[in-house]
C-alpha cells in the first residue's frame, strides 16, 4: 500500500483531490458485470458517495499500476474525473491460477467492472474499466 499512497501524493501535489480506499475484502466475480468486488469501511463509502454523487459520469478514465507479487496479480487502480480533478485509488488482486473463470469472463465481456460496497452490500458503486487486457497475465 505504500505505492498507493505515493501515487495519491503525486496527484495531490498537482492539485487533485484524492480518495484512497482500503478494502477489507477483495474478490473476483464472474457473473454479470464480471470484475472485482471490494468491501470498504462505511466511512470510506461516505467519502466516495460525496465525490461520485456530484457527477458520476465524469469518473470515466482509469489508470492501472501493477505491483510486483509472487503468485498474485496485484494492481493499484486509479479512477479519475478530469472535470473535477478528483481521483479514487484502490488496490485489487487475484490469483491467475485460481481465478481462471474470472480471466475468461472479463475477456469475453470486453471490460472489467469494480463494485465497491459496504459489508452488508446495502450501498454500492460501480466503475467500468474498458481494457480487460491490462488486468490479465
Locate each region found by the language model.
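Long alpha-helical, hydrophobic tracts
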Residues: 1-32
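Glycine-rich, aromatic-bearing surface loops/beta-hairpins
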Residues: 82-137
Amino acid at each position: 500500500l505504500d505505492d498507493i499512497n505515493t501515487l495519491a501524493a503525486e496527484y495531490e501535489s498537482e492539485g487533485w483531490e484524492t480518495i484512497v480506499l482500503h478494502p477489507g475484502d477483495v474478490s473476483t466475480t464472474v457473473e454479470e458485470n464480471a470484475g472485482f468486488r471490494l468491501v470498504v469501511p462505511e466511512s470510506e463509502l461516505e467519502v466516495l458517495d460525496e465525490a461520485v454523487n456530484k457527477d458520476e459520469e465524469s469518473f470515466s478514465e482509469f489508470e492501472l499500476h501493477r505491483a510486483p507479487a509472487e503468485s498474485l496479480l496485484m494492481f493499484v487502480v486509479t479512477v479519475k474525473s478530469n472535470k473535477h480533478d478528483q481521483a479514487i485509488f484502490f488496490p485489487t488482486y487475484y490469483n491467475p491460477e485460481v481465478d481462471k473463470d474470472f480471466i475468461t469472463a472479463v475477456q469475453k465481456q470486453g471490460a472489467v467492472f469494480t463494485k465497491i460496497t459496504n459489508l452488508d452490500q446495502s450501498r454500492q458503486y460501480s466503475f467500468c474499466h474498458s481494457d480487460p487486457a491490462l488486468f490479465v497475465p
